[in-house]
């Protein structure tokens, strides 16, 4: 990301737990998820600082935390998880290049188990269903409903990563030609799992895109653990805010309000 707000808790944690490799790995994964949430949902610097402060306050009061009884404020609340999921399910392509590139690359790395590499200078994101499909051609036959086209156009299911310069002429090719001449490398493959999946689709219809969107949303939910966790009558999913002899437990109900439960 273009900020370093995550560094103070990372440095503090590594200094306090230098010999607990399993707990360090757990913490880094949770911190990456928190940092990703703050980036993807475009939180401003004040909100980011406040959010990390909640974590640092707990770290100060619980320097003896362990993997058996880990830090809690590094977890996303149910409200944050839902906010994260809704953002990821939205119009990714309309975001800033930094945010949309990160989302696509992170998703592709999830699908490839982290084995992919990304050339930032050549990395581009392209639409499968074109932004401006030609009046005469197969695209409007497959996608006759203008509102449906607009709804799915910029969502993640309709986007593929490429490592090549944009080709404005190729963007409006029919699906079969686009796959062969634009999405594939000279060897007939792609270095990205997301693009390979699209290449393997025989047609690109609204039903295909809907199913793909649901599948990709579940990948995010699984890898970033975005399913709800808070249960009525339990402490699951709550924040513990403690410091200077006082503490409170609760959770954010939106980005500005914190509900204190006890």
Predicted stretch roles:
Residues 1-242, 247-255, 260:
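Flexible coil/loop and intrinsically disordered segments
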């Amino acid at each position: 990301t273009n900020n370093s707000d995550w560094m103070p808790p990372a440095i503090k944690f590594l200094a306090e737990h230098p010999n607990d490799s399993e707990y360090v790995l757990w913490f880094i994964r949770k911190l990456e998820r928190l940092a990703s949430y703050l980036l993807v949902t475009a939180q401003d610097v004040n909100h980011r600082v406040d959010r990390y402060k909640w974590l640092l306050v707990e770290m100060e009061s619980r320097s003896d935390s362990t993997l058996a009884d880990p830090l809690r404020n590094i977890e996303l609340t149910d409200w944050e998880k839902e906010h994260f999921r809704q953002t990821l399910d939205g119009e990714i392509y309309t975001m800033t290049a930094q945010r949309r590139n990160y989302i696509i690359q992170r998703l592709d790395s999830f699908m490839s188990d982290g084995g992919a590499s990304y050339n930032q200078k050549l990395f581009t994101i392209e639409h499968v269903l074109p932004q401006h499909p030609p009046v005469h051609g197969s695209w409007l036959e497959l996608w006759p409903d203008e509102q449906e086209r607009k709804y799915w156009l910029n969502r993640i299911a309709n986007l593929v990563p490429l490592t090549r310069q944009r080709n404005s002429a190729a963007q409006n090719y029919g699906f079969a030609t686009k796959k062969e001449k634009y999405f594939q490398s000279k060897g007939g493959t792609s270095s990205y799992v997301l693009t390979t999946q699209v290449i393997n689709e025989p047609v690109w219809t609204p039903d295909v895109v809907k199913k793909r969107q649901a599948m990709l949303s579940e990948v995010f939910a699984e890898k970033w653990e975005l399913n709800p966790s808070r249960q009525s009558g339990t402490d699951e999913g709550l924040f513990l805010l403690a410091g200077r002899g006082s503490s409170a437990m609760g959770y954010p109900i939106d980005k500005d309000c914190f509900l204190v439960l006890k």
